[in-house]
Amino acid sequence: MNHTKYLALLAGCWLVTACENPVDGDLNVDDLDAYTLIYTVNAVEDDSKSTLTFPLERDTVFAVYANLSCIRDPESDVTVEFRTAAELVDAYNEEKQTSYAAMPEACYTIDDTRAVIPAGKYVSSPVMIRLNSAAFDGVGTFLLPMTIERVTPGLPVSPTLGTAYLRINGTYTTNPFRPIDRSGWSVEGFSTEEPEAQTGYDDNGKASSAIDDIPCTYWGTQWRDAKPGPPHWITIDMGKSEELHGFTIRGRADPFTSDTPKASGNPRIFNVDVSDDNASWTRVGTFTVENRIENEVYLDHKATARYFRITVTATQGDMYQTCIADIEAF
């Protein structure tokens, strides 16, 4: 049988599922050992094998396995040693057009990087990665490459399934952060505003209404004469540098003093940028939200800044105008 065709057949049929029933008979193959490979099932293009989202209220573990594919059983234990490979993150991001950050060492602990495939078996004991939730600085996804470093005895490693690119992120079940005191906040700038006084609320419509501690008043962009569409932006000066984990954005209500969101115009997609000097800006998040009266969003990674800018790029109902009733940071 042609060696190349046989290897392709073996890879397609056995590599991922492992060789549960090694063959002892004559397959007209010159070198059965040439079809023996070590790999990790966590390297397979299957999110269930390589991704994890876990609640940041508690620590958790992620298991990585070594696997054996063969025609003839090696008849001995196989020890597979893994190592983390942060140096592979940049190449992965370039190939996949992603921008994952390498997982910081403080975020995980691996007690033993060795996995043993017992004689007669084709799946190893797990390598347990213990995730330290307290070290995660947001809900962003970290990339942790785990590569097969050494195999004893010296069996070959699959060139395509020898490294698992683990993508791990946390979520908050409830918000653990306190709102930042807004007493020193001010509006530093905005795209447009449309004053629209309501009975008892003379400043309604102005940009300052987005931070006035009155949930029914709102900042509204122009609509009477000029009717500019998105993007609409507002810049807030917090008065001093603060550590930011996320924001709560309240939309305009209809009726005015209710908790029912207006059917159109509230933010649907918005960017958040931060700055220390109101001149040089860094993008820290882009968010898509539903038309709820309040939306809570978390940064991928915490940021420290004095200024933040919210830029609405699309609105509910694709209306040209937008409104924000209240902005809180935490």
Regions picked out by a protein language model, each given a short descriptive name:
Residues 15-18:
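C-terminal motif of bacterial Sec signal peptides marking the signal peptidase cleavage site
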Residues 20-110, 118, 122-124, 135-142, ...:
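Acidic/polar, low-complexity intrinsically disordered N-terminal segments immediately downstream
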Residues 65-69, 130, 237, 250:
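Short edge beta-strand/loop segments characteristic of extracellular beta-sandwich folds
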Residues 115-123, 288-292:
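Short proline/glycine- and polar residue-rich coil/turn motifs
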Residues 165-237, 252-264:
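Disordered, acidic Ser/Thr/Pro-rich linker "stalks" and the adjacent N-terminal cap
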Residues 229-231, 239-248, 304-306:
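Extended extracellular/luminal ectodomain segments enriched in beta-structured repeat modules
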Residues 242-260, 310:
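A short beta-strand element within beta-rich, extracytoplasmic domains
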Residues 258-330:
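Trp- and acidic/polar-enriched beta-sheet ligand-binding modules for extracellular glycan
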